[in-house]
Amino acid sequence: MEKLILRRVDRQNEEMILNFGPQHPSTHGVINFLVETDGEVLKRATPDVGYLHRSIEKIGELVGYPGFMPYTDRVDYVAAMFANEGYAIAVERLLKIEVPQRAQWLRAISCELCRIASHLVSVGTMVMDIGAFTPMLHGIRERETINDLLEALCGARLTYNYHRIGGVAFDLPEGWRDKVLHFLDHFDKFLAEFDRLISFNEIYVKRLANVAVIPGPMAINYGLVGPNLRGSGVDWDVRRDLPYGAYPNFKFDVPVGKGFFGTAGDSFDRYYVRCLEMAESSKIVRQALDSLPEGEITAKVPRNIKPEAGEALGRVESARGELAYYVISDGTNKAYRVRARTGSFTAMCIIEDISRGLMVADLVALISSLDVVAPEIDR
């Protein structure tokens, strides 16, 4: 090894090939990158995926329709509520079931709280990845409060299994609404403080502004979705543009990157779009709690679900963008085909192109700004 190192140092060309992962704190899961460097400059960073592949889609074809719901939690364990809803919507469309209004409102409330919890992990770990540890703990502290609220609602803190085909599993527990509103009052102040201390910190801004810029047309061509797409200046949100559930009844803005401190589509824009989205999610939860209708929380669904032969697509706007389930029924009690379309996979695809010419340290910022979660890649 010593001879190899000396030989490389003596050469004018300092090219090296490194394995960045698969167990590295900055990869946010078991993901590996084959990194080619010339000194401190990246020539290429090629994603090497498959370390967390568990055949989730195939399992969806081996178990009954309701039996697959707990597995959807594992598609994105940081924001599991959205995978529940996407799959439920697809099966409901196969069954031609109308979900009760109260259940739709409860779905929106649970998903928006889950979005805040996921974004807190994203922005917190991003600050940590580029060198500041304490802000991450502030984000985790707020996320723990949300976990407590979701645990009171559905009994779980991470893999919720709350949404059901036809509705939701549980109604609001007594006093839960007031606890959520109390948290949101505190959380709005926390966001303002976080912006003052971190987001608008001169050192932090200089570290992320103009780094790993993804132009809007390139983001579209690569199929980026969610905050990664909107961070590049593309104004698209499934909740508004392809409305589902209770979302047509709520007023909210869709934050879009515009070069807040640098270039539209840079790492800071992707980061700050998520900060702004948390404030919008807070608005949606307040509106949903104020207008929550009375009624049933689940539709009448047959115990043995056998949809007519056909196909359906369930789309939701998850914390990582458009999450879609494509389900084909052959008339039996098991799906013929289940396909999940996630945002993290396309985000991984763009890394090789964008990473060329970056500094090695900027690869960490790029991965964090894309908010990649390993199980969404390996399905």
Curated annotation (Swiss-Prot):
> InterPro entries, per this entry?
NADH_Q_OxRdtase_suD (IPR001135), NDH1_su_D/H (IPR022885), NiFe-Hase_large (IPR029014)
- Gene3D superfamilies reported in the protein's UniProt record: Cytochrome-c3 Hydrogenase, chain B (1.10.645.10)
Tell me the membrane topology, using the record's own terms. Answer: Peripheral membrane protein
Listed SUPFAM superfamilies: HydB/Nqo4-like (SSF56762)
Per UniProt, subcellular location reads as:
Cell inner membrane
The answer to keyword Isomerase applying to this record is no
Domain of life of the organism encoding this protein: Bacteria
First-level EC class: translocase
Catalysis performed (reactions): a quinone + NADH + 5 H(+)(in) = a quinol + NAD(+) + 4 H(+)(out)
GO MF annotations, alphabetized: NAD binding; NADH:ubiquinone reductase (non-electrogenic) activity; quinone binding
Task: List the GO terms this entry assigns under cellular component, sorted alphabetically.
Answer: plasma membrane
- Which UniProt keywords are given for this protein, alphabetically ordered? Cell inner membrane, Cell membrane, Membrane, NAD, Quinone, Translocase, Transport, Ubiquinone
Predominant location: membrane
- Is this entry keyworded Transport? yes
A Pfam short name: Complex1_49kDa
Self-association and partners:
NDH-1 is composed of 14 different subunits. Subunits NuoB, C, D, E, F, and G constitute the peripheral sector of the complex.
HAMAP family linked to this entry: NDH1_NuoD
What name does UniProt use for this protein?
NADH-quinone oxidoreductase subunit D 2
